Structure formats: structure tokens, C-alpha cells
């Protein structure tokens, strides 16, 4: 035979007298969180921007310019002679501070340099000195260009702010 539900003994079932009020109380206590890390505090966003860029000495406003990488301050050196080796680059750049890392890409087919290198310094001061002194210098008879590898561009103006002007 089929199973039958006995409805006559309604005393066995408890009735929730609060009803939906318990659910409403739970929802009120729950916090609404957005995004990664659940941070909605604007102070964290400002702290990140102050870490990534260099402060202008004239004022407290952050200006666009070099951006620090995770490891240090990296310079992008271009127009390197194809037969240049890491030793020649290190010899040229070591006068301005301790070099943490030099990366010189080589073409796999020819074994020659691809024409650029990444030179990493620990401090901004060392990297800036090397950039200013060696931009336009010569390595193996070829003029090189030195610039920052990571640069934070100028502040973007939102479309809504452009309309107000």
C-alpha cells in the first residue's frame, strides 16, 4: 500500500511564529561587500597611488611620471648594438648605483641582441641618475636611449567633467 501522511497529529509540527522577521533580521545584520578584497575605503586607493608614483617636491600633488615595479626601478634601454653583451651594459650603468638585474633579450636564431635591455636599480635616485647621464650615450659606437620602463600617464578627465567646462 501507499504511504499515507497523518495530518491529524498537527501537534508534532512546530509553527514558526516569527515568520519572515527572522530572515529580515539576518539580512539587516549582513554587510554588503563589493569587489576584490571587499575594500570600499577610499584611503586604500590613495595609498596605492602614492606608492606607485614619485611626489613632486614643489607641492604635495602627485604628478605623472615613473612608476615603481614590484622589485625596483627599471630603466628601458633601446638602440643597443646587436653584438652588445650584458657585461658592456653593466660596465656602463654600474657607475650610478648597484644594479639589481639586467635583462638583455637575445634573438634565438642569430644569437644577437634584439636591441633593447632592462636595467633594474633598487632606488629611484640611482635609476634617475643613470637615466639622465646615459640617455644619448654610446655603447659600442651606437647611441642609446634610456627611459623609464613603467610610466604612469597623466590623470584622465572623466567625460562628465569635460562637459562641465
UniProtKB/Swiss-Prot annotation:
Domain of life, per lineage: Eukaryota
Subcellular location: Nucleus; Cytoplasm
Stretch list, region Disordered: 26-47
Positions of the RRM domain: 73-151
Entry's free-text remark on domains: The RNA recognition motif (RRM) is involved in the interaction with mago. The RNA-binding activity of such domains is therefore uncertain.
Other information: 'Tsunagi' means 'connection' or 'link' in Japanese.
Quaternary context: Heterodimer (via RRM domain) with mago. Part of the mRNA splicing-dependent exon junction complex (EJC) complex; the core complex contains btz/CASC3, eIF4AIII, mago and tsu/RBM8A. Interacts with Pym (via N-terminus); the interaction is direct. Interacts with eIF4AIII.
Designated name of the protein: RNA-binding protein 8A
Lineage: Eukaryota, Metazoa, Ecdysozoa, Arthropoda, Hexapoda
Name of the gene encoding the protein in the UniProt record: tsu
